[in-house]
Design a protein with these regions (language model features):
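Conserved catalytic cores of very large enzyme subunits
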Residues: 1-372, 389, 393-560, 570
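Contiguous, well-ordered alpha-helical segments that form the cores/surfaces of helical PPI scaffolds
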Residues: 376-389, 408, 564
Length: 594
């Protein structure tokens, strides 16, 4: 914390202009992860773990041989994750991990078969016991990975925000045995998550799990269909996995998959890379990264226009918004230049060992042209509150016209910036984990300084303690999961650089209901999650749902409660304490449809 405070202060002092600092202090814009900017490192990434493992690699001046079993592969992946995440900030995704692990399953299987054949066992017995041994390796490997990612902080001092995506394969390119093992890899990973850890099976929150949903694949392949049901079962107990649609008629992720065959896995809780094709016209997703996010405080910008230009504020809002976008653009251009001139030794696993696309440079080389495939995110929050200031109605009442007009305006401006600057810019539906409270406080302070009323202090459905997450409807809306999906459809697809759609479930134990919500989200092209509060009682050891403070079985307050923070899960209550700020906790208490 001390280091973060120091680096944040130094960056503000030496890297930001006076105008940038003024806008940050008032709250018009928010530079995410400001404490890490001075280090010149990248943000979220889709790390090419398969490329790093294949043939061996070097880490911290030690040569690693390629793993000879799936157990050692998972153990080494855990080590790589802890080291690589210390060289960046933000989300670290291991994309399509099931397919990465398949060759190591085959190595383990071959070794086990040879061992049991040497013992003179018949072939049926050899297959049975060899498969049993490999399943046990998978169990131990995923248990080891979960324990590392939930108990061992990286050298930056925090836990690696890791995501694993899985579940997509082309049935025509894999044999029956390979498809069964692909299913088994993911089934064991899901089973380990459901079982939790320790004698009482206490749940964990990392890594985030994302199922890659291809409807045609599920219909054509029995192993895919079995895995989808296993995933839904796990979501109904653990909330994860979330689901990414690859086969919808809607959305850029599905479009890229269907046109290029490339999967754009999410990073962090909701970030997505922009489409980028190499010189041969191939869409490259794995091995790319983001350089950071800067978010707008739309309510402050709107209120500023209303106060400074009371007669023409509806026109002046767009002008002021464009000015703020230019500031963000200028900041990102500086970020691209800083990263371009970094030495590759600043992130050796990514830039010298193949973790990133073309990342096989020498340590003393500059990152250079690798920045051409990196994305920068223009973030938006509080579209619900902004809609109220614009129209006097909540987003669900107004119908989403204003929010869509804002996002379309951003999309047009970013297309212009991209053409002029040659950089990949994207609209990011900011998750606002703690920012939900920060921006609300900034708006409240701005109103006090200007001597005007903060309407969110006295208006039903709103709170001065927090702003609504990105484009989502107000958490207090009493609407059904299907209604929420419909209300957020347009804005979700306009925020191509960062989005997730989630619905709150009162009865997650209803498997068919959970499955119906997920399938509907997949038809709509969503990155879909389901929400409920998952509680574990430290006294009676029983699990409950949608409980925050008191065990319904024994009355104990000794609870560990996992809630959806925004796009990812976190502990909202551990024995009466929470790491979330007061604003986020107020939002969690008010949830009806989030």
């Amino acid at each position: 914390m001390i280091k973060g405070y120091l680096t944040k202060s130094l960056y503000k002092q030496f890297y930001l202009s006076g105008k940038e600092k003024a806008l940050i202090e008032r709250g018009d814009i928010y530079i995410h992860d400001l404490r890490d900017m001075i280090l010149g490192c990248i943000n979220c990434c889709l790390f090419d773990i398969g490329h790093v493992l294949k043939g061996g690699f070097e880490m911290s001046n030690v040569q690693y041989s390629e793993p000879k079993s799936v157990l050692s592969a998972l153990q080494v992946i855990g080590d790589i994750t802890l080291v690589a995440t210390a060289q960046q900030f933000g989300g670290f995704t291991l994309p399509e991990l099931d397919k990465v692990l398949l060759p190591y399953v085959e190595k383990s299987l071959a070794a086990a078969r040879a061992k049991y054949r040497d013992l003179g066992l018949d072939e049926d017995t050899v297959e049975r016991v060899a498969s049993r041994d490999v399943v046990r390796e998978l169990e131990q490997g995923f248990q080891s990975l979960e324990l590392k990612l939930n108990t061992v902080p990286c050298s930056r001092g925090d836990f690696a925000f890791t995501t694993i995506t899985f579940g997509q394969w082309n049935p025509e390119l894999f044999t029956e045995e390979e498809r069964e093992w692909l299913m088994t890899i993911s089934r064991i990973m899901l089973q380990v998550r459901r079982n939790g850890h320790g004698k009482d099976g206490k749940p964990v929150v990392f890594p985030k799990l994302v199922y890659l949903y291809d409807e045609r694949q599920i219909e054509a392949d029995k192993w895919s269909a079995q895995l989808f049901d296993e995933a839904v079962r796990t979501s109904s107990e653990c909330m994860y996995p979330d689901y990414l649609s690859l086969s919808s008629e809607n959305g850029s992720v599905s479009e890229i998959f269907q046109q290029y065959g490339a999967i754009t896995s999410p990073m962090g809780c909701r970030a997505f890379l922009s489409l980028w094709c190499n010189e041969e016209g191939r869409a490259v997703t794995v091995g790319r990264c983001n350089i950071g996010a800067v978010s707008l405080n739309l309510p402050i910008i709107l209120k500023l226009a209303q106060l400074r230009h009371p007669d023409t504020w509806r026109n002046d809002f767009w002008r002021i918004l464009d000015e703020r976008l230019e500031f963000i653009r200028s900041f990102f251009k500086k970020r691209y230049d800083i990263i371009r001139n970094q030495k590759c030794s600043s992130n050796p696993l990514a830039f010298t060992q193949g973790g990133f696309y073309e990342g096989t440079k020498s340590p003393d080389d500059r990152v250079g042209d690798l920045v051409r495939y990196m994305t920068a995110s223009f973030g938006i929050t509080a579209l619900d509150e902004a809609t109220y200031l614009w129209s006097g109605r909540r987003l669900v009442e107004e119908g989403g016209d204003f929010s869509a007009s804002v996002l379309r305006h951003l999309k047009e401006k970013l297309a212009q910036f991209k053409k002029e600057d040659g950089h990949l810019y994207a609209i990011y539906g900011t998750p606002a984990e703690s920012l939900c409270a920060t921006q609300a406080r900034q708006y409240d302070r701005f109103c006090r300084d200007e001597g005007v009323e903060n309407v969110f202090r006295s208006t039903e459905h709103y709170s001065p303690e927090y702003f609504t997450n990105s484009f989502h409807v107000n958490v207090t809306e009493d609407i059904t999961p299907f209604e929420k999906q419909d209300r957020e459809f347009t804005d979700f697809h306009l925020c191509e650089g960062g989005h997730i759609q989630y619905v709150r479930l009162d009865n997650p134990e209803n498997f068919e209901a959970v499955k119906a919500v997920i399938r509907r989200g997949m038809k709509k092209g969503f990155y879909q999650g389901v929400n409920f509060d998952s509680a574990y009682c430290g006294d009676c050891g029983r699990h409950s749902t949608n409980v925050l403070f008191k065990c319904p079985h024994c009355g104990s307050a000794n609870l560990s409660v996992i809630s959806r923070v925004c796009g990812y899960l976190g502990y909202s209550n551990v024995n009466g304490m929470s790491r979330m700020n007061d604003g986020k906790m107020a939002e969690i208490r008010n949830r009806k449809s989030m």
